[in-house]
Amino acid sequence: MNIVENQDDINNFIDCVIDISHSVNSDYWNGEDVMGIFFNEFNRYKKKSESGQVFTPEHITSFMYDLIDVSYSDKVLDATCGSGGFLVKAMANMIKEVGGINTKEAENIKKNQLFGIEFDREIFALACANMLIHKDGKTNLEQLDTRETKACEWIKSKPITKVLMNPPYERKYGCKKIIENVLENVPIGTKCAFILPDKKLEKDRMGNLLKKHTLESIIKLPENLFDAGITTSIFIFETGKPQNERKVFACYMEDDGLERVKNQGRHDIKNRWAEIERYWLCLLFTSPSPRDGLL
């Protein structure tokens, strides 16, 4: 994928951002996906991302972090990490839980608990810059193809406990193969949350996947969440445990409270998201409501 016509320009820009970051105190940042914002601004002036890359809104990365109950002790993987949005959000939340950036635990989180893979060379550069901006040494970021054996072996060698991902949707990039490889190579019992197009992993197309792993929940997301016009859902799996007769909890988050602002994308201008997020987390951590269902 060519983010801009001249790759030297984007490399120079990233270098400038990193240089500026050395003069900025990012200790109190909350895991903002700085380079993801940069990428999306460029893509607003392009017809369509050639690689199917659609970066995840910040409020959804935070929601998914809570949805699978990630904590400071977890080892988090994003095997299609894009600009690193899930990883910087996880890093910020985990460091906050251990008492801040200056703790010994915070240093361990940055060096040993965040793992990312990105196939696209230019996007990988964004992820590295993003982690550097947030004072992380990009220790566990790799430029690999999650569809291939080398990436599978790399994943298998890591002590992953949670997975947060929004893989590229284009058919030629093998979204289903990516999901299968992740589920097959993380430890048994790993909780995984994937954002996928609604029809990408319908139950009748999963086949052997559910013979090995459990699909716990499907949360349909608002239809206008992504500018690309793709309708998506969050699929939550637990690895290494066959589905058998277990039911799948399904629900529809019709509204996230954000509104489109001209030339600025979608924003929570009425501060509705916090209450909406609390409602859905409460619903998903308790019994199903009458308005929602089990598949």
Predicted regions and their residues:
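Long recognition/docking surfaces used for binding and targeting
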Residues: 1-44
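Short secondary-structure junctions and interdomain/linker hinges
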Residues: 20-28, 45, 49, 71, ...
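Generic structural signal for hydrophobic core residues of well-folded globular domains
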Residues: 21-24, 42, 68, 186, ...
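Class I SAM-dependent transferase core
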Residues: 36-59
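Conserved S-adenosyl-L-methionine
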Residues: 53-172, 176, 189, 197-199
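A conserved structural/catalytic subdomain of Rossmann-like adenosyl-cofactor enzymes
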Residues: 143, 155-157, 162-287, 291
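N-terminal low-complexity segments that are often proline-rich with Ser/Thr-Pro
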Residues: 294-295
